[in-house]
Amino acid sequence: LLSAPAAAEKRKVEPLLLSMPLYNQHDYAEPVFAWNEQEVTVEESGCGAACVAMVVGYFEPDDAPEPDDVMSLAGELGLYRGDGLGRDALRLLLDEYGVEGRWRKMDAQAIENTLRKGYPIVEYVGAGYFTENGHYVVLRGITEDGKLLVADPNSEEKTTQKTYRFAAMIQQGKGDYPFMICEKEDASGETAQKGSAQRSAKRK
C-alpha cells in the first residue's frame, strides 16, 4: 500500500506552466564587471541574476533583461559581495524592475497555490539535486502527476527534462525562508500576470 505522501505524489492534477525565458548562465561567460580586481561573470556567479531575469521576463516578456544586464545592475548598485548575490540582493534587483519579492517559508500547498495564482517562486537551495552548496532556481509549473517544473540556470537538462517532488524541493530549501514569492502590479493596482500560465505541463 502507498503511504499518504506517496499517494499524494501520484495524484492527477491540473497541469500548469508559467511561461518565461529559460536562461542558462553558461551562455554568459564574458566578464560583466570587476570586483577586487577579479572579473565577474554570470557563468561563474550569476545564478541569482539569471533567476531575476527569468522572473522579470515572465512579467514583462517584451521588455525582459538578460542575465548579464541584471548582473551589471547588481554591480552598479553595489550588491555583489564576491561570491554571487545574496537573497536581499535578489529582492532589491527585482524591485528595480518593478517586481515585489518576499522571502517565505512554504509548504507544498502554499507553493501550489502561489504558482496557480500566477506568481513564480525563486528558491534558494542547498545540497541536493542542484548544488553542493548554495544555488538559486525558479519554480515555474506543475505537472499532471503533481510534480514541480524547475528552471535551473545551471542546467538545461534539469530545466527541460526533469521534474521534482514537492517534498524534495522543500527539504532542499536552504535557510529559514528559502522561497521568494514574486509579484508585480499593473497600472491599475491589480497583480500583473503578463507571462501566460499555460495549462499544459506534461513530462515523460
Question: What are these regions, as identified by a protein language model?
Answer:
Residues L1-L79, R203:
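Active-site-adjacent structural segments surrounding the nucleophilic cysteine of cysteine proteases
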Residues E9-P15, M20, N24, I142-K204:
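Noncatalytic regulatory segments and standalone regulatory/sensor domains
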Residues E44, G48-V56, P67, M71, ...:
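Extracytoplasmic/secreted envelope proteins and their assembly/folding machinery
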Residues C51, V55-D63, A74-G78, L94-G98, ...:
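Sec/Tat-exported extracytoplasmic proteins
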Residues P65-M106, R116:
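Mid-length scaffold segments of soluble, non-membrane domains
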Residues G82-D88, F130-H135, K158-Q161:
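Extracytoplasmic/secreted cell-surface and envelope-processing proteins
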Residues E100-S155, E185:
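Active-site-adjacent substructure of cysteine-protease-like catalytic cores
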